[in-house]
Amino acid sequence: VPCVFPSPRRPGLYRGGQRCAALAAALLWAWLCMLALPVGSMAASEALPRPQATVARCFDGDTLKLTDRRVVRLAGIDAPELHAPQGDKAQYYAREARKALTERVRGRKVTLRAAGVKHKDPHGRWLAEVLLEDGESLNEALVREGAAFFYPHRDLSPQLQERLRAAQREAIAAKRGLWAQLLSQPVAQATYLGNKESLRFFPTDCAAVQHIKPRNRVYFGNLMDAFMAGYAPARVCPFWPLVP
């Protein structure tokens, strides 16, 4: 459409000018949308080096080792620790989580897909969404069956975060896996304080909550509310039940 401006002598040309202005506005809006696109969503489409691999072993419920010696941390999820910060005991459901991961992938071929801005964590482990041979997301499957929980991060692909958040809500509602007993433990009835900036939550008596800015604080009446909101437990002040 040619850009024709309104003229008092040729009023019929005003409509063409309107179309030109609308086209220019649409192009400007599309350009602004591209600038506003989250970096994580663009990075998530990038291929990781050597994406095809075979799993050799599983260290726990969220970390595995490939036959080419690479160690992969499943992005966007976390599983109970086999060696709890409070001591040598395992956290509740840690052994079951490792078993669930092992049964799904040990000795099998997988595909690694970038999950966000960063490809490696501070420990040198590859961060990835792992796809099974049928195309199913391993990260999402573990959360959906209650073998792991959603662990949000600003660098993570927004699309992956939304899928994991939805899978967790489904698992909680159905009381699958770790949710079957965790939400009936005394810790489930305690109150928690979340940080809107980090998307982590803490027991309200944790000293670390004093460092959360008032505008970033969100209160949860119980444990389920915190998880349903998409927050994850902070590393400090661990409250997860332990097993011998």
Per-region residue spans from a language model:
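Small beta-barrel nucleic-acid-binding modules, primarily SNase/OB-fold domains
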Residues: 2-14, 18-27, 31-244
